[in-house]
C-alpha cells in the first residue's frame, strides 16, 4: 500500500480518471454520488485526507523545474490563486523540451531558447510562481514538513503544506572503464546539449551546422569530420546517430543486444537497423563495450572483438530516476527503482507527491508498477498533482508505454506489451502477427508501406501491444494512436478490427494497415 488511498489501482482503475476539458474536470461517474477510493472521497467538493486545505494561504513546494514540476506549479496556481507556489530548480533552465536536444545538436533547431516553453521571468511575473533557479534541494523532512535548499547565497529552509518531488532522471553512465575521459558525452540536460553542439561546431571548423534541407552524407558538406562512437541503440542513440551523420561524422553505433530499439518488434527493429546501414551508420550488434580507451582524451571504443578509433563518444544507454532525495527522506521506492505512488501520485509520506521521470506509473495492461519516463506522462501527472493540491483530487492515469522515434527517413512507434516475450512475462498467452501494407491508395502518386505488428492474448482476444514502422511521413506514428486507445480501454482485436477509421486516398487505403493487421490477427485467434 502506497500513500493513504488504498492499494494500487488495477488497469481499469488506472484509466478511470477525470476527463479534462480545458481547465475543468468532469468525472466519468453518471451522478454526483461520491466515489470512495481508499480514504479519499471523490466526486464532491470535499477534499480527502491528502488534499485537505488547511487555510487560504497553504504553501505548495515543488522540487524540480521541468515538465512535471512546472505543469503542477502552473495548474495549482491557476486553479487556486491564493495558493503560495514555490519551485526550487538547481539549474538555470526550466520548462524545456529535452526531447528536442538531438535536433538542436543536429542544427535543425538554431537556439536552445527555442526549446524553452515558458521562461523563468514568465513564471514569476505572469504566473505568480515563486521560482528559485540555482537552488538545489538537499533534504526533505516529512515530519517537520520542510525542505532545505542550497544556493550561492547560502542555505534556506522552506516549509510546505504540500510537496511535489519532480527531480526527473539522469543519463545512465554504464560501468565501463574510461567514461570519465575527455570527449565522452551524455545527453540528458540543456547543458549537455550545449556542450555537444559546441563540439560539433569545433569539429566542423566553425562551418554552419547542417540545415534541414541538407542530406546526411558527408559529400554534402564542405568539411568532413572524424569518427564518433555511440554506445546504445535506443532513442537517444538513434536520434544522435542521425544528428551526427548529418554533420559529416562517421558514426559507429554499439549495441549490447542483438537489435536496436529492443522495446519494439523484431520487424520494426530490423527495418530501422537496415535503414541506419543505408545511411552509412556502422552497427555493432551483440557488442558489449569493455572500455573507452585513451590517455586523457578518448581514442577508441573497445569491445571483445573490435577496437574502433573515435574522436568522441556519446553514452546513450538510458536514464535512471533521481530518487536519492526521496530515499534519504524515508519515502518508499518501488520495485522498478523509481518513487512509488498511489493513483493520485501521493507517496508514502503524507502530502508528498512524486511525478515525472523520478516516479513509477501504473501500466494499463498489467495493472503493475512500471517505469517508463516519457514527456506526456510527466506533463499529465504533474498537472494532476496541481489539480489535487488546488482542491480537485485527480488521478494521474495509467500509461501504455507509448513512444515514437525518427531515424533519418524512417519513423517507428510502439505501445503496450510488444511481442511474445513481454506479454508472456506478464502472464498472458500471446499471439503475434505482422503485416506490411500500402500507406496510401495504390493509385495515389505518392506513398510507401507501413509494417504493423500486433500482439493479443489467445484466451481473451484482448489487444496487448503494437509496433509500427514506415518511411518518414507515411503514418506509422499517427496510426499508433488508434491502437493506444484500444489498448487503454481493454479492447479486443475484434473490437479494433471494427474501428471506423477515416479514409481518403492521400492518407491511407480503404482498409487501413491497422485494420488489415487486426483482421489477420483475428483470423489467427479464431
Question: Where are the language model's segments positioned?
Answer:
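Rossmann-like dinucleotide-binding cores of NAD(P)H-dependent redox enzymes
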Residues: 225-229, 235-291, 374-377, 401-414, ...
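Glycine-rich Rossmann-fold phosphate-binding loop(s) that bind the pyrophosphate
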Residues: 64-68, 188, 231-234
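A Rossmann-like FAD-binding core segment of flavoenzymes
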Residues: 82-84, 131-153, 158, 246-341
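FAD-site-proximal beta/loop scaffold in flavoenzymes
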Residues: 180-222, 296-387, 482-485
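Beta1-alpha1 glycine-rich phosphate/pyrophosphate-binding loop at the start
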Residues: 48-130, 238, 242-263
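Flexible, glycine-rich terminal cap/loop adjacent to redox cofactors
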Residues: 63-67, 71, 75-84, 88-90, ...
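Short linear motifs in low-complexity or flexible loops
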Residues: 7, 14, 19-21, 25, ...
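A conserved FAD-binding loop/helix module that cradles the flavin
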Residues: 341, 355-417, 507-521
